[in-house]
């Protein structure tokens, strides 16, 4: 009697192992890529106090109740382990999302100010899109976000400029007569 379950090919075990190994290697490579992309500031706790201006150092055992080993390091070389890298990747993405939200709010405020100034001065502002934020327009181009479902021409990028000036080119507004 064989110890291999019925219906399995003894040669397929090696192939499964190779495929599994290849899959794990890909995952590990991507995790290391994340580690290289995420700013080191997000790993301050995992690398210890190196590079910071804190008065406490790694040579002070028991500082703040921590042992001399860096907080939660799962590797022998003191680098963050896979779980910590993934956790910090999520933190970094959240940080970036907050930055985008802040910039969107600032952009909306500037758009409101631009329309108010245009009304006060009687100036026509047609070289910027005052309907949607630049983030909304950019996301709609890749099929994501609140404007992704709209396939009509209501979402357009800013009008093509007629002059080489970024803003204030009088050629954009005709000859003035």
UniProtKB/Swiss-Prot annotation:
Q: Which SMART domains match?
A: HLH (SM00353)
Task: Provide the alphabetized UniProt keywords.
Answer: DNA-binding, Nucleus, Phosphoprotein, Transcription, Transcription regulation
Which residue positions does Phosphothreonine occur at? Answer: 60
Q: Where is the composition biased (Gly residues)?
A: 168-177
Q: What is its main location?
A: nucleus
Phosphoserine (modified residue): where? 50, 52
Q: Which GO terms describe its cellular component?
A: cytoplasm; nucleus; transcription regulator complex
Q: Alphabetically, which GO biological process terms does the record hold? A: cellular response to oleic acid; mitochondria-nucleus signaling pathway; peroxisome fission; positive regulation of transcription by RNA polymerase II; regulation of transcription by RNA polymerase II
The record's GO molecular-function terms, alphabetically, read: DNA binding; DNA-binding transcription factor activity, RNA polymerase II-specific; protein dimerization activity
Subcellular compartments? Nucleus
Q: Where is this region: Disordered?
A: 1-24, 52-82, 147-177
Domain bHLH: residue ranges: 11-96
Function text: Required for a novel path of interorganelle communication between mitochondria, peroxisomes and the nucleus, thereby maintaining a functional metabolic interaction between the tricarboxylic acid and glyoxylate cycles. Transcription factor that regulates CIT2 gene expression. Binds to two identical sites oriented as inverted repeats 28 bp apart in a regulatory upstream activation sequence element (UASR) in the CIT2 promoter. The core binding site is 5'-GGTCAC-3'.
Subunit: Binds DNA as a heterodimer with RTG3.
The UniProt record's further free-text remark is: Present with 2190 molecules/cell in log phase SD medium.
Instruction: Please state what the protein is called.
Output: Retrograde regulation protein 1
Q: Which organism is it from?
A: Saccharomyces cerevisiae (strain ATCC 204508 / S288c) (Baker's yeast)
Query: Per UniProt, what is the name of the gene that codes for the protein in this document?
Result: RTG1
């Amino acid at each position: 009697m064989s110890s291999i379950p019925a219906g399995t090919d003894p040669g397929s075990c090696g192939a499964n192992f190779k495929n599994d190994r290849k899959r794990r290697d890909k995952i590990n490579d991507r995790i290391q890529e994340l580690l290289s992309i995420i700013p080191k500031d997000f790993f301050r706790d995992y690398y210890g106090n190196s590079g910071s201006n804190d008065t406490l150092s790694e040579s002070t055992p028991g500082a703040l109740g921590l042992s001399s080993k860096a907080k939660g390091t799962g590797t022998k070389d003191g680098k963050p382990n896979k779980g910590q890298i993934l956790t910090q990747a999520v933190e970094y993405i959240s940080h970036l999302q907050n930055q985008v939200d802040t910039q969107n709010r600032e952009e909306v405020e500037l758009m409101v100010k631009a329309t108010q100034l245009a009304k006060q001065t009687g100036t026509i502002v047609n070289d910027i899109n005052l309907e949607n934020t630049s983030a909304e327009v950019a996301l709609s181009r890749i099929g994501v976000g609140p404007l992704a479902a709209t396939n009509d021409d209501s979402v357009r990028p800013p009008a093509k400029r007629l002059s080489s000036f970024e803003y204030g080119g009088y050629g954009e507004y005709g000859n003035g007569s």
